[in-house]
């Protein structure tokens, strides 16, 4: 199990990923695109980094929006893995 980050550490790190929001013990990012095809194309870009890190986001896809939620489920909150994945995903945008 990966170690949970302290609240102070979370608050410091969230400032480094300004396009993400902190919601309880999760990170949330909403990507708005032109249409459903672009939404699915964006989701497909997430597959390789998620598989490589063995850290998979929760996803919600609507017509022109992809909502991404990151948390380390087996740890019950936010860990280093979540912030690394958030930075990776932000780089794909």
From Swiss-Prot:
Entry GO MF terms: 4-alpha-hydroxytetrahydrobiopterin dehydratase activity
Entry keyword Ubl conjugation: no
Keyword Lyase: yes
E.C. no: 4.2.1.96
Cited SUPFAM superfamilies: PCD-like
Keyword vocabulary terms for this entry: Lyase
Catalyzed chemical reaction(s): (4aS,6R)-4a-hydroxy-L-erythro-5,6,7,8-tetrahydrobiopterin = (6R)-L-erythro-6,7-dihydrobiopterin + H2O
Family, per entry: Belongs to the pterin-4-alpha-carbinolamine dehydratase family.
HAMAP family: Pterin_4_alpha
Protein name stated in the entry: Putative pterin-4-alpha-carbinolamine dehydratase
Organism of this sequence: Trichodesmium erythraeum (strain IMS101)
């Amino acid at each position: 199990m990966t170690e949970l980050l302290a609240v102070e550490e979370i608050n410091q790190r969230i400032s480094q990923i300004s396009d993400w929001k902190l919601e309880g013990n999760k990170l949330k990012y909403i990507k708005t695109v032109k249409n459903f095809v672009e939404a699915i194309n964006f989701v497909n870009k997430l597959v390789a980094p998620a598989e490589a890190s063995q850290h998979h986001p929760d996803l919600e896809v609507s017509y022109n929006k992809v909502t991404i939620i990151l948390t380390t489920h087996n740890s019950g909150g936010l860990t280093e893995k979540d912030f690394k994945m958030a930075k990776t995903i932000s780089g794909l945008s």
